[in-house]
């Protein structure tokens, strides 16, 4: 187990009616608020109206229309609004895309230059200050409500990058599972795949992290149990609550404690999203089983067989390779149960850009020097071809 620092400074208000806690929680941070929302779902389901009512004593400025795979163009608009209106705090009302956009705006206000350069250089210290960010979560998926990451896309350059800074961690997050009752089944499925991927990206590694791995397995089993329930009974409170809480703990640093983590599937999927603007969780559901098959070997066998036994209940008396293969098949079957696509070709994607995507992923991320299984450009291209 490697050394680590673990800190989660987000104050979470979890449960029914917790929106009532927002005014008191936010007031010390400021009263001039930029409210960031998506493309209309929070208007249709009435959540935005409830937020405005709760914050009737605050000065609200709205920025709507954040896309899935949030664009740097929207970040630029938000930065201009904040400077023009003297915004003191940013409130994201939505899912991960909205929260990520809000985080980028919060840091962009203090960045001297184009926000896209800030995104590209976040690991080099480009983020030195940020407005406080609060969230009202409406989708269990990315875990952005409790972490210091934001993923931003540039459609002009076909690029999608993660910006990282502890300054981006939300100060307050309102997490009412009832606010996810209206999430359609396809989005619930994609969000659940995203949660699972966040756990698996750090689970698969060489470190002897017994406790952390058992926590990861419990979180995975939670998603596996409750995602189908939430899809068939969208107003099942316990299902929505468990998915929401699992989403936060999947990526707030707990499951990565003491581990070196590679995020290979995310790096590959970011190329797909950048080129084809597909739903992030859908891309991960297609890529992950094929990545697993590609890297299964003597070195990785023990972890894959443990995954099969402890998460999927595969018979431990079987040969380890058989256990591992069945575990991968069970994951694939679970994604089918959620009615997620399992081939890129079903999304109209062919291999014409694969070599370019693979080269870009290898050049701009740490995938080529990953601590678990390094992937060359050719390996990435081969995995993408396996996904067709």
PLM regions: where:
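A glycine/threonine-rich phosphate-anchoring loop and its flanking beta-alpha core
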Residues: 10, 20, 111-208, 302, ...
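Short alpha-helical scaffolding segments that buttress acidic/His motifs in well-ordered protein cores
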Residues: 196-200, 240-251, 288, 331, ...
